[in-house]
């Protein structure tokens, strides 16, 4: 069964499209630095002592990361500067980048405020240029219009384009050609954690229980995956192991939410907390 499914999924491989994934570099932190140049070159994080939304690259050198409690970030980097988030500002700059994206793919898919997927097949064919050339052009336009840098990945589908955009971060690009051998070679040694859709829990199951650490090991243990997981889950694992991913079709775009939270300071007055929560 596993060999048959691999054959069927491989037959679905589409190398006819050129996808571009654009990912802004440390977006929130970069916007804040653009607004306040005194922050340039200093370790800084957007957020507070309870939670960090993002950290600039100076702070990341100390191990400070997004979704990390701020007090831990402060222990890792005592000089860390906190800046409260300003989503109006981030939305403004995000809209500027989207105006650029629309010129290359009117139906681009916005994954969040700071990243987007563009199908640049038509513009490449119409202008007789490569995906890498368009990626460089888009990056230049974004910087020209916003003053912010971004990284880009070019590949035959969205799954691979997203992986590629992370390779030469920050302020770089990586191009994976639309060639089956190139794709299979590229994907085979990828750690499974690099795959969008495989989180920490799934990674732990695959690595610790099944000894699967890379994408080629997914294919080698396909029969085991079909025996242990639902057909849908196993199909997903095999498709990403082949570098197909199931992300290359346009999806209906829905508005994503932006969370906002506040952590209360220590207090002995329980009534005041309930009063605030009742507002």
Name each model-derived stretch.
Residues 31-33, 55-58, 160-168, 208, ...:
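Short acidic, glycine/serine/threonine-rich loops at helix termini
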Residues 95, 99-150:
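Hydrophobic alpha-helical hairpins/lids featuring a short glycine-rich hinge
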């Amino acid at each position: 069964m596993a060999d048959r499914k691999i054959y069927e999924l491989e037959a679905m491989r589409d190398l006819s499209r050129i996808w571009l994934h654009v990912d802004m570099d440390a977006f929130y932190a970069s916007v804040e630095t653009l607004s306040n140049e005194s922050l340039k070159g200093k370790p800084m994080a957007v957020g507070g002592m309870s939670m960090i939304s993002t950290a600039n690259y100076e702070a990341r050198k100390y191990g400070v990361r997004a979704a990390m409690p701020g007090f831990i970030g402060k222990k890792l980097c005592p000089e860390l500067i906190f800046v409260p988030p300003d989503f109006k500002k981030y939305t403004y700059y995000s809209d500027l980048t989207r105006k650029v994206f629309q010129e290359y793919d009117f139906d681009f898919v916005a994954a969040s405020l700071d990243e987007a997927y563009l199908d640049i097949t038509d513009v490449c064919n119409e202008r007789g240029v490569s995906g890498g050339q368009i990626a460089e052009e888009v990056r230049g336009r974004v910087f020209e219009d916003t003053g912010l840098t971004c990284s880009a990945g070019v590949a035959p589908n969205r799954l691979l384009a997203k992986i590629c955009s992370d390779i030469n971060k920050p302020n770089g690009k990586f191009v994976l050609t639309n060639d089956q051998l190139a794709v299979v070679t590229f994907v085979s040694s990828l750690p499974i954690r690099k795959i969008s859709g495989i989180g920490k829990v799934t990674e732990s199951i695959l690595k610790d229980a099944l000894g699967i650490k890379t994408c080629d090991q997914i294919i080698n243990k396909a029969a085991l995956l079909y025996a242990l997981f639902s057909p849908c889950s196993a199909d997903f694992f095999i498709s990403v192991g082949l570098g197909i991913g199931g992300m290359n079709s346009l999806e209906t775009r829905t508005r994503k939410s932006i969370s906002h939270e506040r952590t209360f300071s220590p207090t002995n007055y329980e009534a005041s907390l309930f009063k605030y929560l009742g507002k």
